[in-house]
Amino acid sequence: MVKKLSAFLLIAACCCFSMGETATVRTIFKDGRKISKSVKLEDVSESVKRLTVPKSELSGDVRFIDVVADFAPAKKGDDGYWIHARGTYGKFDKDSGSYGMSRQVIPVWGMKTPSAAFWANVRTYRFDYQFRVEVKNGNYEVFARFDIENVRKWFEPYNDIVVDFNLLSGEDANYSGMGRGYRKFQLERGAVRTIKDRIKDFPELDYLCDAIVVRIQTHAAKPIPEKSIDFTKETELPVVVHMPFGVAEEFVKALKDAGIDKLSICSAGWNFGGYDGRTPQHLPVCAEAGGEDALRRFIETTQKLGFQISAHATLTDCYTVSPMWSPDYVGKYPDGSLDSNGLWSGGKCYRVCQKASYNGWVLKELEDIRALGFKGPHYIDVYSATYPNRCSDKNHSATPEEMAEYQNRILARAKKVFGGAASEAGFDHVAGNIDYINYVDRVMKQYEDHPEKYPLVSGVYPLWEIVYHGIILYNPDRLTQNHTRGRCLYKLEKSGDPRWMEGDGITDPKISLKIVEFGGRPIFYTYKFADVGRIKKAYDEFLPVRRLQRELMESHEEISEGVFLVKYGDGSEIVCNYSKMPFKYRNENVESLSYKLYDGKK
């Protein structure tokens, strides 16, 4: 009976979809004109419909192309929600307002409305669209806005716009179904492999699943200057030592003595000039932190204690103070000017073209770093924390899609050389070649710090986690890092600033619970012995649930106000209770601000 009902619902949903299988394409021109037209969607399958906007329609006077699903209208008071790539969602409960995100960790957005549930898969220009929610007089419009003007700053439009709308029905007609759908898409096309599948090829990954990451932040670093400066050897700021290699040996011993059996140490600031100091050059080893012999002893000591230790590397940033400095490998605009972004320890930061570095020095440098003794997930900063850069240099021109391919080639080589690879955040253009990330995104922290800026946002669901749990190891958000240290005393985002390691000491049980609910694992950035006990506390919190790191997350739902049920592929279930009262599940009480694990293997 259940199967017949599900089949009926699928047929009914598809019929409804067929009756309205159009999308509105709205062209916004540079002079402010707008032209909208209804476009019939192409049948890819019974439940997948494709929108194509030919590149011939992306002429020089086009600024934006908006893509709106006609078949899922929503207004205030409707049951359901819109959902963004990270899992940020909003209920249909506002009269007016707007929300937008210019960057998406996965090229997906979705809606659940009274008439339809779907997830949209952006197949082209995934690095060039904004996610938008606009509400006027209680009517919601949720759409992708393709920034054609920005594409043209670098290249003439080189692809059609292609968006696939995936219809959901029955038990799949929710954000869990959206996540499972995109995960299936990624697995079936070979873009990613599960952890269980990869372990046979990368045994270091098996250890990593049971370990938390402690990132020594940093051994040494120059202070971040106040002004954007092209430093020289004569004008650069001095390196400040935070945890020299000899002291780091004592630090890892203290962690072992605290009773921690498995850790993956990420050594940041070991390199030439300290953290972000003189990249793209990493060698020789930072003399101020102790030099190569001391680093080798630190690595050897760490490994003898039974811990992993890997190196932090920065391949996207370069500075004029580096002995390797050359404008030849820097990404360039069409007019030949250098692509720069940000201000870090090395001064004004320029973006390295990954095509140029791959065909230049990077592959050899990976081997040279491995020769120091590092083994485990080689950490390459930034790759998964933002979009790939672009380059119009005629000698190594690359679209962001091509740049992503070179990032993946470098990560794949790192996996072969070190036994694994890692990066910073959850942007999934490199998902097939990373084992862990430091955090998925920073939206939870943003919403908590400034809720007044996001009136349309109701919260965050683990959409990304349903896609990638059991594929990539992660911590959910900047908000949930270093959580047993308390909240950061300073309102800053730059982890290269030592003040980022200062906590207020006030722990919040809701943060610990959020890590469990979202299937994450703790991570610590530190150079202080005062954090040893805090790291041990975080590790103890992780122990009861760490075996689930190898499992796929199958669903997440709110089963009562403030109570969430998470199901895993092996049959395990976790109930997380944020409410003020105990919640009864399976005839057992789940106490307030706690969780209970129901082990699927028992």
Please annotate each region the language model reported.
Residues 8-16:
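Bacterial N-terminal signal peptides
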